[in-house]
Protein backbone atom coordinates (compact mmCIF):
# COMPACT_ATOMS: atom_id res chain seq x y z
CA UNK A 1 0.00 0.00 0.00
CA UNK A 2 2.83 2.41 0.84
CA UNK A 3 4.49 1.60 -2.50
CA UNK A 4 1.24 2.39 -4.27
CA UNK A 5 0.94 5.73 -2.44
CA UNK A 6 4.54 6.48 -3.36
CA UNK A 7 3.68 5.96 -7.02
CA UNK A 8 0.64 8.20 -6.75
CA UNK A 9 2.68 10.90 -5.00
CA UNK A 10 4.94 11.05 -8.05
CA UNK A 11 2.37 10.65 -10.81
CA UNK A 12 -0.61 12.74 -9.66
CA UNK A 13 1.15 16.12 -9.40
CA UNK A 14 3.57 15.70 -12.30
CA UNK A 15 0.90 14.50 -14.75
CA UNK A 16 -1.94 16.78 -13.67
CA UNK A 17 -1.58 18.73 -16.92
CA UNK A 18 -2.85 15.72 -18.90
CA UNK A 19 -6.38 16.56 -17.80
CA UNK A 20 -6.24 20.33 -18.17
CA UNK A 21 -8.52 20.43 -21.23
CA UNK A 22 -10.10 16.96 -21.21
CA UNK A 23 -11.23 16.70 -17.60
CA UNK A 24 -9.86 15.01 -14.50
CA UNK A 25 -11.10 11.48 -15.17
CA UNK A 26 -8.50 10.54 -17.85
CA UNK A 27 -5.73 12.01 -15.66
CA UNK A 28 -6.88 10.01 -12.62
CA UNK A 29 -7.26 6.77 -14.58
CA UNK A 30 -3.75 7.16 -16.00
CA UNK A 31 -2.13 7.86 -12.63
CA UNK A 32 -4.00 5.27 -10.58
CA UNK A 33 -3.24 2.61 -13.21
CA UNK A 34 0.45 3.48 -13.53
CA UNK A 35 0.89 3.59 -9.75
CA UNK A 36 0.29 -0.19 -9.67
CA UNK A 37 3.72 -0.63 -11.26
CA UNK A 38 5.36 0.86 -8.16
CA UNK A 39 4.17 -2.10 -6.07
CA UNK A 40 6.85 -4.33 -7.64
CA UNK A 41 9.60 -3.82 -4.98
CA UNK A 42 7.10 -4.44 -2.17
CA UNK A 43 6.22 -7.79 -3.73
CA UNK A 44 9.85 -8.84 -4.06
CA UNK A 45 11.52 -7.54 -0.88
CA UNK A 46 11.51 -9.21 2.56
CA UNK A 47 11.63 -7.26 5.82
CA UNK A 48 15.20 -6.62 7.07
CA UNK A 49 16.74 -8.95 4.48
CA UNK A 50 20.26 -8.10 3.29
CA UNK A 51 19.30 -8.75 -0.31
CA UNK A 52 16.95 -5.75 -0.25
CA UNK A 53 19.90 -3.46 -1.01
CA UNK A 54 20.16 -5.22 -4.36
CA UNK A 55 16.50 -6.02 -4.98
CA UNK A 56 15.21 -2.46 -4.57
CA UNK A 57 17.47 -0.66 -7.09
CA UNK A 58 17.28 -3.51 -9.58
CA UNK A 59 13.48 -3.67 -9.34
CA UNK A 60 13.25 0.12 -9.70
CA UNK A 61 15.00 -0.15 -13.07
CA UNK A 62 12.23 -2.56 -14.07
CA UNK A 63 9.59 -0.11 -12.77
CA UNK A 64 10.85 2.55 -15.15
CA UNK A 65 11.08 0.01 -17.97
CA UNK A 66 7.39 -0.83 -17.43
CA UNK A 67 6.40 2.84 -17.20
CA UNK A 68 7.85 3.52 -20.64
CA UNK A 69 6.55 0.39 -22.36
CA UNK A 70 3.12 -0.67 -21.04
CA UNK A 71 0.31 -0.36 -21.83
CA UNK A 72 0.01 1.02 -25.39
CA UNK A 73 3.77 1.79 -25.67
CA UNK A 74 3.73 3.22 -22.15
CA UNK A 75 3.92 6.74 -20.77
CA UNK A 76 7.38 7.22 -19.29
CA UNK A 77 6.98 10.95 -18.70
CA UNK A 78 7.32 10.95 -14.90
CA UNK A 79 10.36 8.73 -14.49
CA UNK A 80 12.59 9.90 -11.65
CA UNK A 81 15.58 9.21 -13.89
CA UNK A 82 14.60 12.28 -15.93
CA UNK A 83 15.10 14.66 -12.99
CA UNK A 84 18.89 14.85 -12.63
CA UNK A 85 19.90 17.35 -15.33
CA UNK A 86 21.26 19.75 -12.69
CA UNK A 87 22.72 17.15 -10.35
CA UNK A 88 26.47 16.66 -9.76
CA UNK A 89 26.25 13.25 -11.41
CA UNK A 90 24.35 14.25 -14.57
CA UNK A 91 27.09 12.69 -16.72
CA UNK A 92 25.64 9.30 -15.75
CA UNK A 93 23.19 9.92 -18.60
CA UNK A 94 26.02 9.93 -21.12
CA UNK A 95 27.57 6.73 -19.78
CA UNK A 96 24.70 4.40 -18.85
CA UNK A 97 21.56 6.35 -19.77
CA UNK A 98 18.20 6.69 -18.08
CA UNK A 99 18.17 3.10 -16.86
CA UNK A 100 21.56 3.66 -15.27
CA UNK A 101 20.35 6.86 -13.65
CA UNK A 102 17.32 5.01 -12.24
CA UNK A 103 19.71 2.44 -10.76
CA UNK A 104 21.86 5.18 -9.21
CA UNK A 105 18.90 7.04 -7.68
CA UNK A 106 17.40 3.89 -6.17
CA UNK A 107 20.78 2.78 -4.82
CA UNK A 108 21.33 6.16 -3.14
CA UNK A 109 17.90 5.86 -1.52
CA UNK A 110 18.43 2.44 0.01
CA UNK A 111 22.13 2.38 0.95
CA UNK A 112 22.64 2.90 4.70
CA UNK A 113 26.12 1.50 5.37
CA UNK A 114 28.73 4.29 5.42
CA UNK A 115 31.25 2.06 3.66
CA UNK A 116 28.81 1.41 0.83
CA UNK A 117 27.98 5.12 0.60
CA UNK A 118 31.67 5.98 0.16
CA UNK A 119 32.09 3.30 -2.50
CA UNK A 120 29.06 4.67 -4.38
CA UNK A 121 30.44 8.22 -4.15
CA UNK A 122 33.76 7.10 -5.65
CA UNK A 123 31.98 5.28 -8.47
CA UNK A 124 29.84 8.33 -9.31
CA UNK A 125 32.88 10.63 -9.23
CA UNK A 126 34.73 8.32 -11.61
CA UNK A 127 31.97 8.70 -14.20
CA UNK A 128 33.39 12.12 -15.13
CA UNK A 129 36.66 10.50 -16.20
CA UNK A 130 35.22 7.83 -18.49
CA UNK A 131 36.23 8.85 -22.03
CA UNK A 132 33.97 8.96 -25.06
CA UNK A 133 34.69 9.80 -28.67
CA UNK A 134 32.51 12.89 -29.06
CA UNK A 135 34.32 15.41 -31.29
CA UNK A 136 33.39 19.03 -31.99
CA UNK A 137 32.81 19.85 -35.64
CA UNK A 138 31.99 22.98 -37.65
CA UNK A 139 29.19 25.25 -36.37
CA UNK A 140 25.86 25.98 -38.05
CA UNK A 141 23.74 29.12 -37.63
CA UNK A 142 20.15 28.19 -36.77
CA UNK A 143 17.01 30.27 -36.27
CA UNK A 144 14.13 28.93 -34.16
CA UNK A 145 10.75 30.55 -34.81
CA UNK A 146 8.06 30.56 -32.11
CA UNK A 147 5.04 32.03 -33.85
CA UNK A 148 2.53 31.47 -31.08
CA UNK A 149 -1.18 30.73 -31.34
CA UNK A 150 -4.35 32.77 -30.85
CA UNK A 151 -5.93 30.42 -28.31
CA UNK A 152 -4.37 27.87 -26.00
CA UNK A 153 -6.09 24.49 -25.78
CA UNK A 154 -7.43 21.82 -28.09
CA UNK A 155 -8.82 24.51 -30.41
CA UNK A 156 -5.47 26.24 -30.94
CA UNK A 157 -5.88 25.81 -34.72
CA UNK A 158 -9.64 26.24 -35.08
CA UNK A 159 -9.10 29.11 -37.52
CA UNK A 160 -7.46 27.58 -40.59
CA UNK A 161 -4.08 29.07 -41.62
CA UNK A 162 -3.88 31.32 -38.55
CA UNK A 163 -0.97 29.41 -36.97
CA UNK A 164 0.79 29.23 -40.34
CA UNK A 165 0.46 32.98 -40.92
CA UNK A 166 1.85 33.75 -37.47
CA UNK A 167 4.99 31.73 -38.19
CA UNK A 168 5.27 33.10 -41.71
CA UNK A 169 5.05 36.70 -40.50
CA UNK A 170 7.41 36.15 -37.56
CA UNK A 171 10.01 34.67 -39.91
CA UNK A 172 9.62 37.42 -42.50
CA UNK A 173 10.02 40.24 -39.99
CA UNK A 174 12.85 38.77 -37.90
CA UNK A 175 15.28 37.05 -40.28
CA UNK A 176 17.34 38.69 -43.02
CA UNK A 177 18.40 36.92 -46.24
CA UNK A 178 21.35 34.55 -45.75
CA UNK A 179 21.56 35.48 -42.05
CA UNK A 180 21.41 31.83 -40.95
CA UNK A 181 22.01 28.38 -42.40
CA UNK A 182 18.68 26.87 -41.33
CA UNK A 183 15.29 28.08 -40.11
CA UNK A 184 13.16 25.73 -37.99
CA UNK A 185 9.43 25.98 -37.30
CA UNK A 186 7.74 23.87 -34.60
CA UNK A 187 5.34 20.96 -34.81
CA UNK A 188 1.95 21.96 -36.30
CA UNK A 189 3.29 25.38 -37.39
CA UNK A 190 1.70 24.68 -40.78
CA UNK A 191 -1.87 23.92 -39.79
CA UNK A 192 -3.10 22.96 -43.27
CA UNK A 193 -1.88 20.24 -45.63
CA UNK A 194 0.91 21.63 -47.84
CA UNK A 195 0.33 18.83 -50.36
CA UNK A 196 -3.35 19.76 -50.78
CA UNK A 197 -3.02 23.53 -50.49
CA UNK A 198 -0.70 24.73 -53.23
CA UNK A 199 -0.84 28.37 -52.14
CA UNK A 200 0.56 27.52 -48.70
CA UNK A 201 3.35 25.41 -50.17
CA UNK A 202 4.22 28.18 -52.64
CA UNK A 203 4.42 30.78 -49.85
CA UNK A 204 6.90 28.64 -47.91
CA UNK A 205 8.93 28.00 -51.06
CA UNK A 206 9.03 31.74 -51.80
CA UNK A 207 10.04 32.54 -48.22
CA UNK A 208 12.88 30.01 -48.40
CA UNK A 209 13.99 31.43 -51.74
CA UNK A 210 13.79 35.08 -50.62
CA UNK A 211 15.80 34.36 -47.47
CA UNK A 212 18.18 32.05 -49.36
CA UNK A 213 17.78 29.63 -46.45
CA UNK A 214 16.32 26.13 -46.01
CA UNK A 215 13.25 25.96 -43.75
CA UNK A 216 12.21 22.91 -41.72
CA UNK A 217 8.51 23.10 -40.90
CA UNK A 218 6.18 20.99 -38.78
CA UNK A 219 2.98 20.10 -40.59
CA UNK A 220 -0.03 17.81 -40.51
CA UNK A 221 -0.70 16.13 -43.84
CA UNK A 222 -3.05 13.45 -45.09
CA UNK A 223 -1.93 10.43 -47.09
CA UNK A 224 -3.88 7.45 -48.38
CA UNK A 225 -3.30 5.73 -45.01
CA UNK A 226 -4.51 8.68 -42.92
CA UNK A 227 -3.14 11.70 -41.08
CA UNK A 228 0.61 12.16 -40.73
CA UNK A 229 2.54 14.39 -38.34
CA UNK A 230 5.55 15.48 -40.37
CA UNK A 231 8.74 17.51 -40.48
CA UNK A 232 9.21 18.86 -44.02
CA UNK A 233 12.37 20.49 -45.36
CA UNK A 234 12.02 23.23 -48.00
CA UNK A 235 15.17 24.16 -50.00
CA UNK A 236 13.17 26.03 -51.43
CA UNK A 237 11.24 23.08 -52.92
CA UNK A 238 10.34 20.17 -50.68
CA UNK A 239 13.48 18.02 -50.49
CA UNK A 240 12.96 15.68 -47.51
CA UNK A 241 10.06 14.60 -45.32
CA UNK A 242 10.00 12.76 -42.00
CA UNK A 243 6.80 11.27 -40.57
CA UNK A 244 6.48 10.90 -36.80
CA UNK A 245 6.91 7.24 -35.86
CA UNK A 246 6.11 7.19 -32.14
CA UNK A 247 2.56 8.45 -31.74
CA UNK A 248 0.94 9.66 -28.55
CA UNK A 249 -1.67 7.17 -27.28
CA UNK A 250 -4.99 8.90 -26.57
CA UNK A 251 -3.54 12.05 -28.17
CA UNK A 252 -2.79 11.07 -31.77
CA UNK A 253 -4.63 7.77 -31.77
CA UNK A 254 -7.10 5.98 -29.50
CA UNK A 255 -6.12 2.38 -28.63
CA UNK A 256 -9.55 1.71 -27.07
CA UNK A 257 -11.70 4.19 -28.92
CA UNK A 258 -15.11 2.92 -27.77
CA UNK A 259 -14.01 2.88 -24.12
CA UNK A 260 -12.30 6.27 -24.38
CA UNK A 261 -15.35 7.87 -25.96
CA UNK A 262 -17.54 6.57 -23.15
CA UNK A 263 -15.18 8.06 -20.56
CA UNK A 264 -14.51 11.46 -22.12
CA UNK A 265 -16.58 13.49 -24.55
CA UNK A 266 -13.34 14.95 -25.92
CA UNK A 267 -12.26 11.57 -27.29
CA UNK A 268 -14.49 11.99 -30.33
CA UNK A 269 -12.38 14.99 -31.33
CA UNK A 270 -9.21 12.91 -31.70
CA UNK A 271 -8.44 11.68 -35.21
CA UNK A 272 -6.14 8.69 -35.54
CA UNK A 273 -2.75 9.47 -37.05
CA UNK A 274 -0.72 6.99 -39.10
CA UNK A 275 2.86 6.36 -37.85
CA UNK A 276 5.85 6.80 -40.10
CA UNK A 277 8.14 3.85 -40.76
CA UNK A 278 11.52 5.38 -41.58
CA UNK A 279 14.25 7.19 -39.71
CA UNK A 280 15.27 10.23 -41.77
CA UNK A 281 18.56 12.13 -41.66
CA UNK A 282 18.14 15.67 -42.97
CA UNK A 283 21.10 17.19 -44.81
CA UNK A 284 21.63 20.95 -45.17
CA UNK A 285 24.84 21.95 -46.93
CA UNK A 286 26.65 18.93 -45.58
CA UNK A 287 25.42 19.31 -42.00
CA UNK A 288 23.23 16.41 -40.88
CA UNK A 289 20.49 16.33 -38.26
CA UNK A 290 17.38 14.39 -37.33
CA UNK A 291 14.14 15.58 -35.78
CA UNK A 292 12.15 14.18 -32.89
CA UNK A 293 8.55 15.35 -32.99
CA UNK A 294 7.05 16.12 -29.55
CA UNK A 295 6.23 12.83 -27.77
CA UNK A 296 9.08 11.03 -29.55
CA UNK A 297 11.62 12.59 -27.21
CA UNK A 298 10.58 10.24 -24.37
CA UNK A 299 11.22 7.12 -26.47
CA UNK A 300 14.52 5.65 -25.26
CA UNK A 301 14.81 3.45 -28.35
CA UNK A 302 15.62 6.54 -30.42
CA UNK A 303 18.72 7.31 -28.32
CA UNK A 304 21.01 5.26 -30.53
CA UNK A 305 19.80 7.21 -33.60
CA UNK A 306 20.76 10.65 -32.27
CA UNK A 307 24.27 10.55 -33.72
CA UNK A 308 24.01 13.22 -36.41
CA UNK A 309 25.69 16.63 -36.14
CA UNK A 310 22.92 18.03 -33.94
CA UNK A 311 19.39 17.19 -32.84
CA UNK A 312 16.11 18.99 -33.55
CA UNK A 313 13.03 18.65 -31.37
CA UNK A 314 9.81 20.13 -32.78
CA UNK A 315 6.81 20.37 -30.49
CA UNK A 316 3.42 22.02 -30.11
CA UNK A 317 2.61 22.83 -26.49
CA UNK A 318 -0.50 24.92 -27.18
CA UNK A 319 -2.73 21.97 -26.27
CA UNK A 320 -1.36 21.94 -22.70
CA UNK A 321 -1.86 25.61 -21.87
CA UNK A 322 0.16 27.30 -19.14
CA UNK A 323 1.06 24.15 -17.20
CA UNK A 324 4.27 22.51 -15.91
CA UNK A 325 4.23 20.33 -19.04
CA UNK A 326 6.22 22.99 -20.88
CA UNK A 327 9.07 22.97 -18.36
CA UNK A 328 8.97 19.19 -17.97
CA UNK A 329 9.34 18.62 -21.70
CA UNK A 330 12.22 21.09 -21.96
CA UNK A 331 13.95 19.21 -19.14
CA UNK A 332 13.55 15.91 -21.00
CA UNK A 333 15.13 17.58 -24.04
CA UNK A 334 18.09 18.51 -21.82
CA UNK A 335 18.46 14.83 -20.88
CA UNK A 336 18.56 13.89 -24.57
CA UNK A 337 21.28 16.48 -25.16
CA UNK A 338 23.47 15.05 -22.39
CA UNK A 339 23.04 11.39 -23.29
CA UNK A 340 23.70 11.99 -27.01
CA UNK A 341 26.49 14.54 -26.56
CA UNK A 342 24.68 16.75 -29.06
CA UNK A 343 23.40 20.30 -29.13
CA UNK A 344 19.61 20.48 -29.35
CA UNK A 345 17.46 22.98 -31.23
CA UNK A 346 14.19 22.81 -29.31
CA UNK A 347 11.35 24.74 -30.95
CA UNK A 348 7.73 25.07 -29.80
CA UNK A 349 4.66 26.94 -30.99
CA UNK A 350 4.16 28.51 -27.56
CA UNK A 351 7.31 27.78 -25.55
CA UNK A 352 9.74 27.16 -24.21
CA UNK A 353 11.75 27.48 -27.45
CA UNK A 354 15.42 27.04 -26.53
CA UNK A 355 18.92 26.14 -27.60
CA UNK A 356 20.51 23.44 -25.43
CA UNK A 357 24.22 22.67 -25.47
CA UNK A 358 25.75 19.20 -25.40
CA UNK A 359 26.01 19.35 -21.60
CA UNK A 360 22.28 19.90 -21.21
CA UNK A 361 22.49 23.61 -20.39
CA UNK A 362 19.91 26.01 -21.86
CA UNK A 363 21.92 28.74 -23.59
CA UNK A 364 19.12 30.73 -25.26
CA UNK A 365 15.37 30.69 -24.72
CA UNK A 366 12.26 32.68 -25.63
CA UNK A 367 9.49 33.76 -23.28
CA UNK A 368 6.47 31.50 -23.11
CA UNK A 369 3.42 32.45 -25.20
CA UNK A 370 5.22 35.38 -26.86
CA UNK A 371 6.08 35.28 -30.58
CA UNK A 372 9.81 35.47 -31.14
CA UNK A 373 12.88 34.24 -32.98
CA UNK A 374 16.03 32.87 -31.38
CA UNK A 375 19.22 32.72 -33.44
CA UNK A 376 22.40 30.92 -32.43
CA UNK A 377 25.50 29.39 -33.94
CA UNK A 378 25.32 25.78 -32.81
CA UNK A 379 28.38 23.60 -32.40
CA UNK A 380 27.99 20.29 -34.21
CA UNK A 381 29.44 16.97 -33.05
CA UNK A 382 30.43 13.55 -34.31
CA UNK A 383 30.90 10.23 -32.54
CA UNK A 384 28.83 8.14 -30.16
CA UNK A 385 28.43 8.36 -26.41
CA UNK A 386 28.87 5.22 -24.33
CA UNK A 387 25.14 4.83 -23.69
CA UNK A 388 24.52 4.89 -27.45
CA UNK A 389 26.92 1.96 -27.74
CA UNK A 390 25.48 -0.20 -24.96
CA UNK A 391 21.79 0.27 -25.77
CA UNK A 392 19.50 -1.62 -23.37
CA UNK A 393 22.36 -3.42 -21.59
CA UNK A 394 21.64 -1.83 -18.19
CA UNK A 395 18.01 -2.97 -18.25
CA UNK A 396 18.91 -6.47 -19.43
CA UNK A 397 21.66 -6.88 -16.84
CA UNK A 398 19.43 -5.47 -14.09
CA UNK A 399 16.67 -7.94 -14.93
CA UNK A 400 19.15 -10.81 -14.98
CA UNK A 401 20.71 -9.81 -11.65
CA UNK A 402 17.27 -9.39 -10.10
CA UNK A 403 16.23 -12.91 -11.11
CA UNK A 404 19.55 -14.32 -9.84
CA UNK A 405 19.26 -12.46 -6.51
CA UNK A 406 15.72 -13.69 -5.95
CA UNK A 407 16.76 -17.22 -6.90
CA UNK A 408 19.74 -17.14 -4.53
CA UNK A 409 17.57 -15.85 -1.68
CA UNK A 410 15.07 -18.64 -2.28
CA UNK A 411 17.86 -21.22 -2.37
CA UNK A 412 19.32 -19.97 0.93
CA UNK A 413 15.90 -20.21 2.54
CA UNK A 414 15.53 -23.81 1.36
CA UNK A 415 18.98 -24.90 2.56
How would you describe each model-predicted region?
Residues 133-389:
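Soluble catalytic domains of enzymes that build or remodel membrane lipids, polysaccharides, and related
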Residues 1-129, 322, 349-350, 363, ...:
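Membrane-embedded alpha-helical bundles of multi-pass enzymes
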Amino acid sequence: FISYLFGLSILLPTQHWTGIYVGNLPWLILCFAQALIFILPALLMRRNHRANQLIFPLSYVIIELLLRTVPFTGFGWSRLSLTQTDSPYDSVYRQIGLAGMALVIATIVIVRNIKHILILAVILASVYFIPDNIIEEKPIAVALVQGGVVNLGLDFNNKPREVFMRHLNQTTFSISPSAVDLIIWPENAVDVDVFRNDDIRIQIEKLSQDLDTPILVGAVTRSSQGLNNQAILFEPKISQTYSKRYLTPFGEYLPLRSVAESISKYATRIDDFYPGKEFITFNVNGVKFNSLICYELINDSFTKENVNDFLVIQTNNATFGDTPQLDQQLNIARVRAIESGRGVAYVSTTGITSFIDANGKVTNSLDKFEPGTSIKEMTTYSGRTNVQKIGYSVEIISLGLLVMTLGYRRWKMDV
